[in-house]
A protein has these predicted regions:
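Alpha-helical cap/lid subdomain in secreted, periplasmic
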Residues: 43-46, 64-201
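Serine-esterase "nucleophile elbow" of acetyl-processing enzymes
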Residues: 1-76
Length: 201
């Protein structure tokens, strides 16, 4: 049985839709990717055009497949940089792993010619104390990251370790436990853009 959060949401952006001369990249995630997507697009403006799909829906929920269909509709993507893991904590870790397998299957079916890069989930810290990891929630983030790494390694999909960058400096945090300051988003965008640029080269 799917147990959703009290409020679920999703967002779609397609930047520079008029550009046909550059490869198109799709970023998939939650509000974390929404925080750095425009910055990544700015950094890649001479190399690629960027779209992003962010959602609160957890893998395993059938709704995410309907959202994926819309995110991929109308464009051929050269690269998909994707994540899911900070929402849906009513979902057990075994169910998360099973749902992630189906999520990857769907992405590969929708973009069979694209390069795929998994981006792991970022840390959850104590609200107002960004130097402290949340003792209840962050261990689950780490376990989901471990499960995802095992899945991606078996499927020969590269893993982008954004967790290690996000956790490296409390100044990157906005202080709310989840999201990032301007400095943090700039740092995450620098890294993600570099990973994508290298993969497209």
């Amino acid at each position: 049985m799917i147990v959703r959060e009290s409020t679920e949401w999703c967002r779609f952006y397609w930047f520079k839709t008029e550009r046909k001369d550059l490869p198109r990249v799709l970023l998939i995630g939650d509000s974390i990717v929404a925080g750095y997507a425009q910055l990544v697009a700015d950094r890649l403006e001479d190399q690629a055009t960027v779209a992003f799909f962010s959602t609160s829906i957890c893998v395993g929920d059938p709704a995410i497949y309907r959202q994926l269909d819309l995110a991929f509709a109308g464009y051929d993507f050269a690269l998909v940089h994707f994540n899911n893991g900070l929402h849906g904590f009513t979902t057990t870790e075994p169910d998360y792993a099973a749902g992630l397998e189906g999520f990857v299957d769907a992405i590969e079916d929708l973009a069979p010619k694209a390069k795929h890069i998994w981006r792991n989930s970022t840390p959850i810290t104590v609200k107002g104390e960004p130097a402290k990891l949340d003792p209840q929630k962050n261990p689950r983030v780490l376990e989901r990251n471990r499960l995802a790494t095992d899945i991606m390694t078996r499927r020969e999909i590269p893993v982008d370790d954004l967790y290690s960058i996000a956790v490296s400096d409390p100044a990157f945090s906005s202080g709310d436990g989840y999201h990032y300051s301007q400095q943090g988003n700039e740092t995450l965008a620098d890294h993600v853009a570099q990973v994508i640029s290298k993969a497209l080269s």
